């Protein structure tokens, strides 16, 4: 099976890891995180508006998934211990294929034949199934993750326009410098 760069699709996995920490009592969705202009990276449409007041962990997850905010993702990565800890979280849930190595925006480089920040379709599908329908997260956390994905504002409108009436979609797209 071929490896593919994750690009921003990793943000769902990241917020799943954050929610797992919330469920374990190691994090609080209402905790406010303050950051500075120096923390902002390319494409941060939500976090750039909250330099003075900061954002809660819940707001950062929402920004990361629904608007693909890169600074939000980096701040959340910091809360779990960085890229290596996200990979460790995935390994602990049985995904030994997916690897997350970089911070935003470097992870979007997608250099051919480079396994950094990649996964395989079957591994991603299995991991998403475990996060969204399995017992890894509490029911409340699973529903929160689904709610964020249903509210995706990046690719969601395009995908939703093709759905039959009454159908819904929960998604997280990703694109990089090489497509």
Predicted regions and their residues:
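Extracytoplasmic
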Residues: 1, 5-9, 28-30, 90-95, ...
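Short, well-structured active-site flanking segments
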Residues: 20-39, 87, 138-142
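Conserved catalytic neighborhood of penicillin-recognizing serine enzymes
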Residues: 40-76, 83, 114-117, 121
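Short, Gly/Ser/Thr-enriched beta-strand-loop segments that form substrate-interacting elements
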Residues: 156-179
């Amino acid at each position: 099976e071929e490896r593919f760069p994750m690009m921003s699709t990793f943000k769902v996995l990241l917020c799943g890891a954050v929610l797992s920490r919330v469920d374990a009592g190691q994090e609080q969705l209402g905790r406010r995180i303050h950051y500075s202009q120096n923390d902002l990276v390319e494409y941060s449409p939500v976090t750039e508006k909250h330099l003075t007041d900061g954002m809660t962990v819940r707001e950062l997850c929402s920004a990361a998934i629904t608007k693909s905010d890169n600074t939000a993702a980096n701040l959340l990565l910091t809360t779990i211990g960085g890229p290596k800890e996200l990979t460790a979280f995935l390994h602990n849930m049985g995904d030994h294929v997916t690897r997350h190595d970089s911070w935003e925006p470097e992870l979007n480089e997608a250099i051919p034949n480079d396994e950094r920040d990649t996964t395989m379709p079957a591994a991603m599908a299995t991991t998403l199934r475990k996060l969204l329908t399995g017992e890894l997260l509490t029911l409340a956390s699973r529903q929160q993750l689904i709610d964020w994905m249903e509210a995706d504002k990046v690719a969601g409108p395009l995908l939703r326009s093709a759905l039959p009436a009454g159908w819904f979609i929960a998604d997280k797209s990703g694109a990089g410098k090489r497509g």
